[in-house]
Amino acid sequence: MEPHREQGVIGLMYHKFDENKYPSTNVRMKDFKDQLKMIRKMKLDFISIEEFDDYVHGHRELYNKRVLLTVDDAWASFYRHAWPILKKEGIPFVLFINTREINQKNKNYMSWAQIREIHESGLGVIGHHSYSHDYIVGWEENRLRADLERASQDFRRELGSIPEYFSYPFGEYSLEFKNIVKDMGFRLAFGQHSGVVDSRKDRFELPRFPINENWGKADRFEMVLNTLPMPYKEFLPADKKVSEFKNPPQLEIEFVPGLKNLKNIVCTTNDGDSWPTVPLRFVSENRVVLDPINPYRVRTARINCSFADSPKHFRWLGIQFVLPHISADK
């Protein structure tokens, strides 16, 4: 299938369920149930991680849009509220687990017994989310590898095997981190930048739409389900880690041919509490250069690009950079 004709896979990322004190990482159960109904109403099918793996490795074509459901951190509220619904409805999902809190028997997290229940269900697949769930980008390589290996030992002890799929803590990754994840044998790795997965996507920079109390509202969730991929041939810079000496970075993207209305692309970026438009210019029919104006003052820098493919469907590309020299509190 030609890249511009792919409808792709919408990755949804959840954390907490009905923990209303944490709106940025929580989804209300009423909203979650409504979201599942909306997915069914729009006649979208869920995809298992095994089928998704085949798709991004080029072993399977998808002729209709699919939805991949993922959950990060193994909060107890997932097991208490969402797991019974997913089990009843037979919805496949991936549960990414950071093992330190599980080992410590933190009451806010699931237990190893509960994780084994999901692992053995044939429905939920357990993913790797590091040991500490710390701000890892910027660590020395030995320390980074030791953290991941410690979690791998926990998985081997408790589940009998090491997960094949990885989720970067806080969605942060650098070229070095990505290469370490590859070297350790993982098949896929997910970030927290928004966007639709197409078959050309880097298998170690896979996007997901974070769903929370804001993005979980019906109108915004419907918009997410109506998005299409924005496939590209080349993306520069290859490293998503930004040094204080190259802040802000210049971006250059070569999109695939055939993207209708690409000339209408608009990109915005987070600058404090606002999302100003990023100046851009076409250097060829399908190649765009983005020149953010102001240096980023936050550790996590985001750029979102979109344009209308039809009155109801937008193409969407989310980008996340990490500035490890800036405190995570900013």
Q: Where are the model-predicted features located?
A:
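A general structural signal for short secondary-structure junctions and capping/turn motifs
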Residues: 2-3, 195-198
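Terminal accessory/targeting
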Residues: 1-65, 77-80, 84-110, 211-330
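Metal-dependent polysaccharide deacetylase catalytic core of the NodB/CE4 family, i.e.
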Residues: 7-23, 42, 63-67, 75-177, ...
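Acidic, His- and aromatic-enriched active-site or binding-groove loops in soluble protein domains
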Residues: 71, 186-195
